[in-house]
């Protein structure tokens, strides 16, 4: 007798009441099975009370919900922003970093930062948050030599961390730094859970799948990964959070491999972050959604390796810059704004440069590069007196075929290549897979590099333009070295007088403009799509898209 017949025999033996219950149970189980097949990552909560579902595009999905590794993955940053809390937080209304779990006092000489923890702070498991957790996060983890996030570790290089008492921790820095305070927005980790984990192994630890933080939301359903490439996590409002409670009881995040995948299932989400480019019209044409535009402190540029034999000549760099008509490049763009200086605190209009092919050709002539019109084999390419060709290598990241990133990257690179070849350059373009691209960037094996840079909360230029940062882990991608620029960058860090700082910024912008280490092209414009189920969402003056959650206590269900 097979299994089915056995079940039928058992059910026939039931009385009428038991048969009804059995049939109902089978029906419920069948519905649940259908739901799991059709919606393997949940029904998404569109009709559920106080549940708000956001869609995120991330090729790698949500991976590690840990505040010390959010630089690796934007999707992780979104979730971590709600799960964890730091000593300080970014306030988009004041555009400043303000007190959060810690109350800060700074010494008169601006080298000592003392935090006193608020009363009543608790982790999501109900245990108290103390200064020991702060000391553990910064001293035992970030400053450990084996900690893998080199950029974060560099931010605290030379910093002395002292545990004063159970509520107080002190940070001592070598020199005043107006930007240093922005480092304290980093979420704090629970010592009582992670003290036995080697910092070198923290990125792979299971804690990152179902973390315990002290933020406004706690994990309700741990991180799940599905065969169709989606990842999902559900958070619930934390009863232990010290701040104002949100009206949103549950936040659900679903990460899709591509925007196309998300749009196919857009009726399953309430909000979508970082909509851009050709996808804008998909939401404009959908009556459910309205779009909120926002910009981030980031830009895309072509960095010129000043250690390249050809690019060591300023006239060559000037020719590359002057030949690019940014207005033509961006004429049909709905998600890009022209940029002429990397200093986001300054007005871009004040640093506008004029495109001129005549000046570009003149600069190449001044550099000693001429056409060899009499030689057919050398036609169209300039050469110097040593018969060295005006030949450059140009690298860019290769994105997945058919994606918006791939289309836009190729479009811009091909535009630039066409312009430069028209004035006598021979450009060898390489689109490189992610790991190869990173390797080439770290080793600085390129003449021209097409890439974007994000500045973060402090707008500190040190990492990007100081000569000490032209290293594999540094972000001085042009190998730009200038004593005057280094001095200005250091003064901007050390001077707390705002007028003096503004003057130094303008002088720095002037030096960068004159030296031409890069061609600054544009900054992206993004859109947040919301179906209006909640009100109060603001994207004004955010630094990261996740900063919208700074005001989540003001979000209300309509």
Can you name each region flagged by the protein language model?
Residues 237-283, 426-428:
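Ligand-site clamp/hinge motif
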Residues 186-246, 250, 260, 357-358, ...:
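Gly/Pro-rich hinge or "lid" segments in bacterial periplasmic/extracellular proteins
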Residues 273-363, 384-386, 390-392, 398, ...:
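Local pocket/hinge segments that shape ligand/substrate recognition
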Residues 58-77, 99-102, 127, 180-189, ...:
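A structural "hinge/loop" feature
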Residues 151-198:
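Surface-exposed binding/hinge segments that line
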Residues 29-37, 321-350, 408-417, 441-558:
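Detector for C-terminal structural segments
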Residues 227-231, 370-452, 526:
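Ligand/substrate-recognition segments at binding pockets and active sites
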Residues 55-108, 139, 212:
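N-terminal lobe/hinge region of extracytoplasmic solute-binding protein
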């Amino acid at each position: 007798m097979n299994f089915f017949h056995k079940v039928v025999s058992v059910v026939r033996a039931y009385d009428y009441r038991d048969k009804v219950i059995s049939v109902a149970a089978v029906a419920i189980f069948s519905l649940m099975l259908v739901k799991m097949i059709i919606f393997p990552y949940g029904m998404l909560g569109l009709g559920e009370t106080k549940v708000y579902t956001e869609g995120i595009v991330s090729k790698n999905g949500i991976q590690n919900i840990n505040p010390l590794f959010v630089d690796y993955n934007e999707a992780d940053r979104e979730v971590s922003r709600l799960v964890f809390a730091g000593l300080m937080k970014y306030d988009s209304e004041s555009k400043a970093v303000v007190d959060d779990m810690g109350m800060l006092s700074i010494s008169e000489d601006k080298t000592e930062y003392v935090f006193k923890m608020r009363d009543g702070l608790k982790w999501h498991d109900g245990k108290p948050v103390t200064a020991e957790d702060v000391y553990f996060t910064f001293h035992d983890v970030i400053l450990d030599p084996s900690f893998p996030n080199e950029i974060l570790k560099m931010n605290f290089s030379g910093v002395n961390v002292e545990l004063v008492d159970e509520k107080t921790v002190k940070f001592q820095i070598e020199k005043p730094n107006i930007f240093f305070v922005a480092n304290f927005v980093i979420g704090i980790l629970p010592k009582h859970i992670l003290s036995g984990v080697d910092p070198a192994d923290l990125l792979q630890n299971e804690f990152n799948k179902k973390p315990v933080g002290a933020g406004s939301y706690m994990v309700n359903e741990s991180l799940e990964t599905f065969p169709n490439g989606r990842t999902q996590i559900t958070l619930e409002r934390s009863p232990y959070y010290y701040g104002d409670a949100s009206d949103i009881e549950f936040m659900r995040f679903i990460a899709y491999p591509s925007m196309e995948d998300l749009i196919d299932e857009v009726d399953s989400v309430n909000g979508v972050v970082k909509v851009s480019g050709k996808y804008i019209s998909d939401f404009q044409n959908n009556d459910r959604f309205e779009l909120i535009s926002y910009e981030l402190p980031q830009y895309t540029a072509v960095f010129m390796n000043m250690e390249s034999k050809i690019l060591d000549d300023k006239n060559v760099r000037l020719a590359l810059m002057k030949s690019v008509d940014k207005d033509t490049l961006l004429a049909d763009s709905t998600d890009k704004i022209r940029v002429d200086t990397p200093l986001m605190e300054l007005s871009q209009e004040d640093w506008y440069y004029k495109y001129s092919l005549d000046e570009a050709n003149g600069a190449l002539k001044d550099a000693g590069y001429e056409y060899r019109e009499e030689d057919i084999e050398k036609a169209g390419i300039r050469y110097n007196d040593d018969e060295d060709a005006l030949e450059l290598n140009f690298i860019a990241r290769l994105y997945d075929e058919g994606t918006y990133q791939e289309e836009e990257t190729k479009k811009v690179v091909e535009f630039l290549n066409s312009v430069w070849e028209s004035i006598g350059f021979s450009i060898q373009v390489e689109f490189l897979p992610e790991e190869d691209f990173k390797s080439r960037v770290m080793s600085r094996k390129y003449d021209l590099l097409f890439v974007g840079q994000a500045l973060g909360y402090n707008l500190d230029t040190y990492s990007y333009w100081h000569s000490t940062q032209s290293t594999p882990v540094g972000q001085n991608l042009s190998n730009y070295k200038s004593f005057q620029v280094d001095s200005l960058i250091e003064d901007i860090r050390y001077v707390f007088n705002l007028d003096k700082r503004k003057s130094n910024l303008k002088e720095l912008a002037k030096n960068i403009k004159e030296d031409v280490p890069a061609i600054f092209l544009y900054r992206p414009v993004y859109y947040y799509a919301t179906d209006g189920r909640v009100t109060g969402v603001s994207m004004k003056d955010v630094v990261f898209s996740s900063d919208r959650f700074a005001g989540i206590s003001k979000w209300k269900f309509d």
